[in-house]
């Protein structure tokens, strides 16, 4: 592997053995900021049977993450020789090609089913959480507090269909890889909801309007940063999104409490 591309074994080097630099390293580290803002992840915390299970859940989750990410690295490095010549978006097919090329059809089918299971599990969780938020928090909470039963059921179904169609439309962009889409969505959720969630837990002075301002500013920053050009805008949009969202929450909450 070192003879083929030394950059594959050096965490400070990118493609073509070029140094990542501050922007590259900071962008990689920034992925961790996104976890507190993922609705489908937060739903797991909310659904836990008892806070006493948190320590056990943490051990299970971290063990699973370490195994999965380590295996992903091994698959990628093995693919350099097993299926050479994959570049750009084609490199995302390395696991599929290795499974169908080197495994028995039955085992290959199990591996491919695993991919679909992971996709469907995450997609279903995100769509259901988004549908619930649109139905209960926005439609019923802001517009029709008296709605219930079949009305909410049909609104929820419409929300599920609309979100699925929107996701399908975004996925049709031929210029983007799966990783590009995931990174953008990860930054959007992390910047919009992450700072509000964390500060709600650890900063008692946060206000309702402060949290709302943080969500709006964080989401808008990610959208606008993606449209910028130049070296500075190579920085992962998660970083400015979280930064500006946090500032918005602190400033609005502070001014609001002073006014009171």
Regions found by a protein language model. Give the residues of each.
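Membrane-embedded helix-loop-helix hairpins and adjacent transmembrane boundary segments
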Residues: 1-260
């Amino acid at each position: 592997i070192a003879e083929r591309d030394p950059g594959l074994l050096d965490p400070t080097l990118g493609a073509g053995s070029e140094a990542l630099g501050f922007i590259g390293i900071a962008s990689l580290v920034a992925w961790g900021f996104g976890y507190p803002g993922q609705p489908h992840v937060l739903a797991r915390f909310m659904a836990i049977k008892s806070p006493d299970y948190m320590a056990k859940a943490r051990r299970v989750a971290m063990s699973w993450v370490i195994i999965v990410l380590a295996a992903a690295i091994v698959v990628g490095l093995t693919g350099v020789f097993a299926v050479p010549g994959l570049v750009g978006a084609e490199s995302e097919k390395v696991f599929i090609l290795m499974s169908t090329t080197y495994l028995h059809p039955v085992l290959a089918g199990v591996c491919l089913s695993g991919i679909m299971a992971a996709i469907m599990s995450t997609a279903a969780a995100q769509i259901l959480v988004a549908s619930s938020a649109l139905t209960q928090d926005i439609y019923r909470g802001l517009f029709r507090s008296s709605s219930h039963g079949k009305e909410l059921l049909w609104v929820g179904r419409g929300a599920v269909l609309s979100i699925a169609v929107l996701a399908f439309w975004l996925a049709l962009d031929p210029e983007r890889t799966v990783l590009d889409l995931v990174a953008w969505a990860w930054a959007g959720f992390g910047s919009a909801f992450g700072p509000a969630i964390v500060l709600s837990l650890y900063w008692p002075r946060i206000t309702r309007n402060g949290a709302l301002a943080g969500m709006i500013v964080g989401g808008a920053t990610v959208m606008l940063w993606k449209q910028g050009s130049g070296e500075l805008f190579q920085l992962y949009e998660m970083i400015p999104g979280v930064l500006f969202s946090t500032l918005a929450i602190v400033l609005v909450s502070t001014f609001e409490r002073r006014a009171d």
